[in-house]
């Protein structure tokens, strides 16, 4: 359990696919590395025992087996010489090497006695060694005492100006802060530790910190990023002589592989690691490897093996007093027993887990444990007790969210805790508490957007000098990356790009926790929501879960929860199959009808309405509802206007909040970017788009083919609106990032981008619109998500006529985090984006019709619907891949008043 650490605010949680090489390049800096490894030895007095010097070196390398042997020998020699100081120092090192082998109370008592010795009170180096041992030993059972020990280590190291021990203390404090639910402080501490280790080329510490962050990322459901960290740690460990066996890195990698659908690879790693722990007599590490083996077995569907591993880990942990490991192993066992219907065994294990939790301050995992107990009570039919436990879990989750340092960590926390919201919703639905069920799900949905709609945004002028310098370096690296296709050069640039990303730190930060709490948006009241709905409008808010999924139906008069005829797994599998057929340019009528029956068929209000506002869940974020076919064989598009929103709360704010000043300019369009290659032929359009979306940030790179239809698309849109004196077109050499940013963006009602787009679900901040680059500017030509959120807009509409611009990283019940959401954060009322790779010529025709209908006074959602109908009327029943990629997210209910 102690391996789990939250990623840092400065985005050390986002690495390139080649991140392992970032740190390996440090091996070339031999002088720095040598200095880092010898710093501890040089800091000791000249008459220090040679054994202690070597033991300290091995200890810093986490090679505690060999270090312990040397500390024991040094202790004997010091006793023979009568050197009390070295005797105490060696004893502290020996005690640290015995973690898991000796009684914790006995070891703690011996350490307390040493620390009370006058020699230890006056010798900072000796005291650091003993306090570090105390902190390591007591972290499992007495985190408060461990925290005080590491805080004193930090203070002493600052007095000695010892950067190595300062960084190590901050990393250990981060672990304890995270377990206590203080995610913002934990993020800051770990960021500082990792930055320091990178600057000093402290390779052993990078192995430790990289493993910690990687395991934390697995906890947050970000396995792809976690794998990069752990690969880096393992590569470094393999290159550093005498380093201890990196158990946490192997555990991290195996868990990440299991999450990524590769459990067999993970199991192979863990079996080797388990043998190593037993050979080295490391019971704490053995218990954690057993837990990881259980997780991998569960991911592979072998639930019997999973429970055996968890139970074995629990027995080993109880025998050795590993409190966190008891809680972790029994929690995992309880989940598996619950899923196979063995509720008595599940409750037995979770009761043991909760008893262990009460002995330590692990606020981060508390909501998850409470949710398991709540789910068990619900399955037993005790809905009142289940609701009480879910309420406790929700309160504990809110405490964590109140401490989150930025909107991405907030989103990741919500994603991790999604089962809490879904389970609580299901219980409220079964109890008939519709308003309460709505409040529960709306607490999570679109949370970061709802919060930031009311929170002041950090503006460019408020960046520190260091942040501005880091941003300039970042842009230079991206410009260079865009120019080269050499794999070796790109690999090096991607590594450097990651390091520059970590120094950017441009995310919005609240002034203080108290102020931030007052700015957090509460879920909208149902009565208030109904006041902003149109007479013919119904909101469909979906909750996908097993065994039952739900649709919360809201119109101006009432709200009702409808149980859908399938669970989340069946709906998600059908959706994935349907989308695969769509992207293959097929009609997929059978699945289109099945999804209609599952998602819309039970909604009895449907025939009485003409406008649907969809609040999606899970895979439904990728599904264009308008392509489904009803009982009459017609598309939903033919009977209903469809738009989408992150949540009902966000929808309410978008319809009620007004910009400080109404925009005076009608249209800003950017297109005809002079990319480097001419297209080969029109049949390759979608393949070209797919290659671009995939290739900007990989080793091979991607060529940017010009989009010949984009010029006429932008010109046609502007002409359709017929406001030439209130429009600005940025075409050809003027279609640059710097030109775009130089415009008074807050003064435009419509922003239109006809450009290439880059989707990056693994690294969402890298998602970008690819504009031109002015050689006189420092901009890189990539308008990235992180930059978009810092814009100040008042636009009624942003149109992203580029591939995959309505996609992003799915953050559980929070929703999608991508380009469309970034523009909503920046102040746009609505965003039109694409769910897949779009056809250049088809897009031109659709957009021309869209703007024509806008100019005629139709509301935004209706104008987009009519443009799609026009396309079908002209070309017949073409597959949805051509006409359905564009969806409207946000408020599409009103026309744009020019």
Where do the language-model regions lie?
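Residue signature of alpha-solenoid helical repeat architecture, marking inter-repeat boundaries
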Residues: 45-46, 85-87, 125, 164, ...
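Residue register of alpha-helical TPR repeats
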Residues: 49-50, 89, 129, 168, ...
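An often Trp-containing, charged/polar helix-loop segment at the C-terminal end
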Residues: 657, 661, 666, 842-898
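Catalytic cores of nucleophile-dependent amide-cleaving enzymes
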Residues: 749-849
């Amino acid at each position: 359990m102690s391996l789990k650490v939250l990623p840092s605010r400065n985005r050390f949680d986002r690495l390139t696919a080649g991140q392992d090489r970032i740190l390996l390049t440090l091996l070339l800096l031999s002088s720095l590395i040598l200095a880092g490894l010898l710093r501890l030895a040089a800091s000791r007095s000249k008459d220090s025992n040679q054994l202690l010097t070597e033991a300290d070196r091995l200890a810093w390398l986490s090679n505690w087996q060999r270090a312990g042997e040397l500390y024991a020998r040094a202790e004997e020699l010091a006793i023979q010489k009568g050197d009390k100081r070295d005797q105490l120092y060696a004893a502290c090192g020996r005690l640290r090497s015995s973690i898991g082998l000796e009684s914790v109370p006995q070891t703690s008592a011996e350490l307390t006695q040493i620390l009370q010795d006058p020699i230890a009170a006056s010798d900072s180096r000796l005291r650091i060694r003993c306090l570090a041992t105390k902190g390591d030993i007591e972290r499992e059972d007495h985190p408060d005492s461990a925290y005080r020990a590491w805080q004193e280590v930090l203070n002493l190291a600052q007095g000695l100006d010892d950067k190595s021990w300062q960084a190590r203390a901050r990393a250990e404090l981060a672990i304890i802060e995270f377990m206590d639910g203080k995610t913002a402080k934990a993020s800051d501490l770990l960021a500082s530790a990792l930055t320091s280790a990178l600057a000093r080329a402290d390779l052993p510490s990078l192995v430790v910190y990289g493993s910690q962050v990687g395991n934390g990322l697995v906890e947050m459901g970000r396995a792809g990023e976690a794998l990069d960290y752990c690969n880096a740690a393992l590569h470094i460990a393999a290159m550093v002589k005498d380093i201890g066996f990196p158990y946490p890195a192997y555990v991290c990698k195996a868990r990440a592989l299991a999450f990524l659908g590769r459990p067999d690879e993970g199991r192979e790693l863990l079996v080797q690691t388990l043998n190593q722990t037993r050979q080295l007599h490391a019971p704490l590490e053995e218990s954690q490897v057993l837990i990881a083996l259980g997780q991998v077995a569960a991911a592979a569907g072998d639930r019997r093996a999973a429970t055996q591993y968890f139970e074995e880990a629990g027995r080993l942990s109880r025998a050795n007093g590993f409190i966190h490991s008891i809680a972790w192993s029994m929690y995992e066992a309880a989940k598996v027993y619950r899923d196979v219907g063995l509720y008595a065994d599940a409750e037995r294990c979770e009761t043991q887990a909760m008893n262990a939790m009460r002995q330590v301050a692990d606020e981060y995992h508390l909501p998850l444990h409470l949710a398991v107990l709540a789910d068990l009570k619900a399955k037993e039919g005790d809905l009142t007790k289940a609701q009480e436990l879910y309420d406790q879990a929700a309160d504990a989750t809110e405490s964590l969210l109140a401490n989150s340092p930025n909107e991405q960590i907030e989103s990741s926390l919500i994603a991790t805790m999604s089962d809490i919201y879904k389970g609580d919703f299901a219980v409220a639905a079964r109890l008939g508490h519709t308003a309460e069920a709505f409040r529960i799900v709306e607490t999570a949905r679109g949370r970061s957007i709802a919060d930031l709609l009311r929170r002041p945004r950090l503006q460019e002028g408020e960046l520190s000098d260091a942040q501005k310098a880091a941003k300039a370096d970042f842009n230079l690296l991206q410009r260079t990356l865009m120019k080269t296709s050499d794999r070796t050069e790109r690999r090096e640039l991607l590594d450097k790009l990651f390091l520059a990303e970590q120094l950017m730190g441009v995310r919005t930060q609240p002034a203080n926790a108290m102020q931030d709490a007052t700015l957090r948006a509460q879920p909208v009241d149902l009565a208030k929501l109904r006041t902003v709905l149109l007479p013919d409008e119904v909101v469909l808010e979906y909750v996908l879960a097993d065994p039952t999924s739900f649709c919360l139906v809201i119109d101006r008069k009432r709200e009702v929860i409808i149980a859908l005829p399938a669970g989340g797994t069946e709906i998600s599998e059908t959706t994935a199959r349907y989308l695969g057929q769509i992207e293959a340019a097929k009609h997929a009528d059978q699945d289109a009808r099945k999804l209609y029956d599952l998602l819309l068929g039970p909604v009895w209000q449907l025939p009485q309405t003409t406008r649907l506002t969809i609040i999606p869940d899970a895979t439904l974020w990728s599904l264009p509802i308008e392509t489904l076919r009803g009982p009459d064989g017609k598309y939903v598009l033919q009977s209903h206007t469809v738009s989408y929103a992150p949540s009902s709360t966000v929808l309410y704010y978008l319809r009620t909040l007004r910009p400080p000043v109404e925009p005076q300019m009608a249209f800003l369009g950017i297109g005809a970017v002079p990319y480097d290659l001419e297209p080969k032929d029109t049949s390759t359009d979608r393949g070209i788009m797919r290659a671009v979306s995939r290739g900007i940030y990989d080793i091979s790179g991607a060529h940017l083919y010009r989009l010949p239809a984009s010029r006429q698309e932008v010109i046609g849109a502007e002409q359709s609106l017929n406001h030439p004196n209130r429009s600005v077109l940025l075409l050809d050499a003027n279609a640059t990032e710097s030109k775009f940013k130089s415009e008074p963006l807050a003064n435009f009602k419509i922003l239109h981008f006809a450009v290439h787009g880059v989707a990056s679900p693994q690294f969402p901040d890298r998602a970008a619109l690819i504009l031109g680059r002015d050689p006189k500017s420092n901009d890189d030509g990539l308008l990235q998500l992180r930059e978009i959120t810092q814009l100040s807009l008042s636009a009624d509409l942003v149109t992203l006529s580029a591939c995959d611009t309505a996609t992003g990283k799915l953050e559980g019940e929070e929703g999608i985090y991508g380009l469309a959401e970034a523009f909503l954060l920046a102040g746009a009322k609505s965003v039109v984006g694409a769910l897949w790779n779009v056809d250049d010529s088809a897009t031109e025709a659709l957009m021309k019709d869209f703007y024509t209908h806008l100019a005629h006074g139709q509301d935004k959602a209706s104008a987009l619907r009519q443009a799609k109908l026009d396309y079908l009327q002209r070309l017949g029943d073409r597959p949805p891949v051509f006409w359905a990629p564009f969806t409207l997210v946000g408020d599409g209910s009103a026309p744009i008043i020019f």
